[in-house]
Amino acid sequence: MKTRLLFFLVASSFVVGLAQASHHKGDRPLNVLMIAIDDLKPIGSVFAEDPENFLQHVYPNKKLRTEVANRMTPNIQRLADQGITFMNAYCASPACNPSRAALMTGIRPHKSGLTTNAGGIFFRDYMYAGVRYLENAQTMPQYLRKHGWYTASTGKIFHRWSDYHHSDNPRSWTDWVNVTSSAGERVPSKWESSGLKWGQEGDDDASFTLLDDYRKADFMATVLETGQASHEGITFQVSKDQPFFLALGIFRPHLPFYATKDLLDLFPVEEMNITYDLLEMYKNDGDDVPEFAFNWSGLARDEKGDPILGNDRFTTMLRHGLSIDRNQGDLEGWKNMLQHYFASCAIADRAVGRILDGLEKSPYADNTLVILWSDHGYALGEKLHMTKFALWDDANQINFFVKDPRNPQSAGKRSYRPVSLIDIYPTVMSMAGLDLPDPRITGHDLTPLFVNPDANWEVPAQSTYGDVANNMIRTEERKLIQYMDGGREVYDMLKDPEEFDNLAGKSVVVKTEAELEKLLEIAIEEGSYSSN
């Protein structure tokens, strides 16, 4: 297996060389605009027609489903039409803190030991095995700044993001500011439950343009359009004389799901096909889930060992709905939650639209690499699970779009090769013409896929959550989840993209399971923990 991986790396180096040659032969340094979105599962835009997409269940009518996707994410679709979409992209860890720390430092969670949100600790302060492993890591903007790039950000890029120090200032950023705004008073929905908050923000006439995320995007768009913008005495300033790395962090659709009425009205609950059959399907999906994984879902077992409702946020929401209305209150609560999540996705999309408008109106569009990612996925009831914090695709698969102005042939293309957010760091450095600053950075340069989305790619995606011994490995066809107690899940992702049928231990996949296990061993060894 190591021989196959080495062959891939050698073979792809030729394509990388071609890509780098096109990027650096007499060209001015590339600008980077990075857009980060919190808790956005691949649900709208180009993903809506994937057979495993959650919208397929909520809106089984294709015409209506297309309309809903267009209401939800028209601007993200616009970016997809301009660049390449990675259809099988994964986070390094399905939680904000480890995912973002890994992406920004290039160091994998099973290597740093940061595999959970860890109480919100600042990533540089996190200690694993007696070592602050990320304390002196060079982040992507930090390294670019060292080599002459102007770096600036607003919004959530790192997990701790609303104050100066925990946004990694002044190491990562030349300039940083927290732009805040509100559409008005928040009115909770009667259907919200413990641990889950949603409702309407502002009065009925309030516009999404007043919301916090949109104002952040407007600020950054103004920087691009006019060359500068100021907030609270901090001025961002860009010019053609210096390459820049601008990062916009969009908080929605992270909880709480508060949205303005103009966006909530786009997703009437009457259009949703939420049924007890769907609920029962997700409950029964737990019949072959390893015991350890029950910690991550709303599943429990009765005395016979059959799956029943447990105590996840999702099942708590269902019970709260029944306390309001014993006649389908659980389904009504579910639909109401989805309405507010979808509207929150639309907030993120409108912010994306504003920053894309700003770039298109600026003099930098032809020389700016645009990267949009979500830090992880988000379960909305699958396996009776809600939020992230699991190694199933609902929580682990992400949005990942790249618009490379120097590879216009990739516009509208899709790549089904498995990739990871950990690959962004080496890709940006490759396109910037810089060597990697740290041997602990073990992601892969994605530029061959910019040139040819179907290029040979034998590197799997790998994720870790909860402990360095809980890992997922994903090829284009298969997936293995290995838990710290020895439990595992194996899925045929071509035949079973929703991960209903756990094949672990079955004779039909003995060889495949062994191959996946070997791939996982290689991935772990490649980025194993060391205090050196």
Label every PLM stretch briefly:
Residues 219, 229-230, 376-382, 410, ...:
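C-terminal cap/loop subdomain of S1 sulfatases and analogous C-terminal strand-loop tails that border
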Residues 114-152, 157-264, 268, 319-332:
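Formylglycine-dependent
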Residues 48-54, 357-413, 420:
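Histidine-centered active-site microenvironments of extracellular/periplasmic hydrolases
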Residues 214-232, 325-368, 523:
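A long, amphipathic alpha-helix that forms part
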Residues 41-138, 143-149, 163:
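Active-site segment of extracytoplasmic enzymes that catalyze sulfate/phosphate-ester chemistry
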Residues 23-30, 37, 42, 85, ...:
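Long, internal low-complexity/basic segments
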Residues 32-40, 156, 245-248, 398-401, ...:
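A short aromatic-rich beta-strand->coil structural motif
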Residues 28, 64-73, 90-94, 129-137, ...:
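A short beta-strand-to-alpha-helix junction
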